[in-house]
Amino acid sequence: MKVGITYHEKFSQYDLGPGHPFRGDRFINVLRLFEDQGLLSLPNVTVLSPQAVSRQHLLKVHDGEYVDLIFRLAETSRPYDVETPVSPQILEAALLIIGGAVEAGKAIYEGRVGRAVALGCGYHHAGRNYGGGFCLFND
């Protein structure tokens, strides 16, 4: 059975700073570990390259006013709250990470892989009209 792993080099932009557990290098470190263990050279493992989700895609889950707020905050690198920073880089990474979840599901649905791992996913503290717990959006 073929296994897909979603990854994009810009995932590492979801970095909340030195000493924080949400560091951007965690994505590179996981990929490096996979490489060191020979997982990425296995014939049944493929890296899936996600595309950033659109605003329209976000609106399937999130309120439009909330989505607009996050995009405005990103323009000026202002935080959403004390634990949820926003910047153009973090927003770009978030849209790609969510795109990774979409790509993983799509690859399974289309039969390109039997299973998939969406690196970076698990941002579950955001609700329809709020963020929190380091999460801008719910993936």
Language model segments and positions:
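HDAC/HDAC-like amidohydrolase catalytic core signature
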Residues: 1-139
